[in-house]
Amino acid sequence: GTADIVIADLPCSGLGVLGKKTDLKYKASPEGIESLVGLQRKILSCVKDFVKPCGVLLYSTCTVNPAENIENVHWFLKEYPEFYLDDIREKLCPELRDSVEEKGCIQLLPGIHQSDGFFIARLKRKPD
């Protein structure tokens, strides 16, 4: 890969934006989420190739569903050991540092962060 950073803001169930799109709660189904997880993994498997050694892959969704968020990150790290979670705590404003769940991941939640629900993971490619 040749990119310093790749941002993968992927299609998701949108469960983090229910306050704005209330119809989503009636459309969400286990089958639909399973299909989205498969699509997210396919996209991640493709875009990782664009990240150069020591480059960053930012994975983000607008959902609070663990299957689409942290579980995808764990899957990705297992499948692609050339990547690791890069600590983001010091890159965040002080108000968000306590929201870091795992070293390189943050889950923003409605009602806590005055925002919609978002998930962001910072995955870094190891040097060659």
Each language-model region and where it sits:
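C-terminal catalytic and target-recognition region of SAM-dependent MTase-like enzymes
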Residues: 2-7, 11, 50-128
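Mobile active-site "lid"/loop adjacent to the S-adenosyl-L-methionine
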Residues: 3, 9-46, 63-68
